[in-house]
Regions:
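Outer-membrane pore/translocation modules
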Residues: 54-176, 219
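Outer membrane beta-barrel transmembrane domains
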Residues: 7-13, 169-269
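Transmembrane beta-barrel architecture of outer-membrane proteins
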Residues: 23-31, 85-89, 139-143, 177-181, ...
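Residues on the lipid-exposed face of transmembrane beta-strands in outer-membrane beta-barrel proteins
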Residues: 31-39, 47, 90-94, 107-109, ...
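Membrane-spanning beta-strand positions in outer-membrane beta-barrel proteins
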Residues: 38, 44, 89, 102-104, ...
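Surface-exposed strand-loop-strand hairpins of Gram-negative outer-membrane beta-barrel proteins
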Residues: 1-30, 62-64
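Outer-membrane beta-barrel channels and translocator barrels
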Residues: 40-42, 52, 97-101, 152-155, ...
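Outer-membrane beta-barrel pore domains and translocons
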Residues: 1-4, 50-52, 95, 108-112, ...
Length: 269
């Protein structure tokens, strides 16, 4: 399970005759249910089903950042809580030893079950209420990843890379941006059965399009470098871990969300 709070601020002139700030605060939570089954020596099938909850709170402010009331509300934002499944992943994965290293790879597809919304920018231009939050891509997207790990005395080390590629558009004309992820982490015993984990994560999201066109807002591309720290330990027949990821560097095009930290809690067996 993971969660974060994000903030987005932008100026609009659509609700009132004068420009006002939209101060949007979102709390995003996701629980991912993962199951694996072995089908041959070193080969297995993995299914990942995410369930998301997004809580949105909006405040309107004048240019001096004093709260104001918009009598007729906004077609863009509202106080609401959305929930539902994201796009599940179905993957084949394999692993093998190579000297002191363990190498692994997985490949599969994301299944378009997450809710998608009509073009919010087109609806906004027509003065109609709309929704920007997408729970899925609406397309079957290939997913592939590789990892390698080994131990150096008391220290474990692992590197990981993953890509989700989007080649088509969904029924609303939406094509999500490709996503790339890489990480490197080391772990070491710190107390009893507890192990400390520290690493770096790099995430890249390409530009989304609607009807083949890039809009002036939305996901226009961003790159995030994050530091991660956490602890893990065996628990019964499984393992428990807690991780915090803090953004170090963000490079984004256009007005995009900011977040202070991502917290993740997991249990596996």
């Amino acid at each position: 399970m993971s969660g974060t709070k994000v903030h987005n601020e932008h100026v609009s002139t659509e609700e009132l005759p004068v420009a006002i700030y939209h101060e949007e605060h979102l709390t995003i939570s996701e629980a991912a249910f993962v199951t694996e089954v072995g089908v041959a020596h070193g080969v297995g099938i993995e299914a990942i089903v995410p369930v998301r909850v997004v809580r949105t709170r909006i405040q309107f402010e004048d240019l001096a950042h004093e709260p104001i009331v918009v009598p007729n509300g906004s077609i863009h934002h509202r106080n609401e809580t959305l929930s539902g499944p994201g796009d599940p992943w179905l993957l084949v994965h394999g692993a093998r030893g190579l000297g002191a290293w363990t190498l692994a790879a997985r490949a599969g597809v994301s299944i378009p079950l997450g809710r998608t919304e009509p073009n919010p920018f087109d609806l906004g231009r027509r003065g109609l209420p709309h929704q920007h939050i997408q729970f899925g891509t609406g397309t079957w997207d290939p997913v592939a990843g590789v990892s390698a790990g080994r131990r150096f005395g008391q220290v474990g080390f692992v590197v990981h890379a993953l890509a989700r590629l989007v080649f088509g558009t969904n029924a609303h004309g939406y094509q999500a941006g490709d996503r790339f992820y890489a990480s490197a982490a080391a772990d070491r015993r710190i107390a009893g059965a507890w192990r400390g984990i520290a690493g770096l994560d790099l995430a890249r999201e390409q530009t989304e399009t609607w009807g083949g066109h890039i809009e002036t807002e939305g996901n226009l591309g961003r790159t995030d470098l994050l530091a991660s720290v956490g602890v893990a330990r065996p628990l019964g027949r499984g393992a428990f871990h807690v991780t915090a990821k803090v953004p170090l560097v963000t490079r984004a095009t256009g007005a995009q969300v900011d977040y202070p930290v991502i917290l993740a809690v997991g249990f596996s067996r």
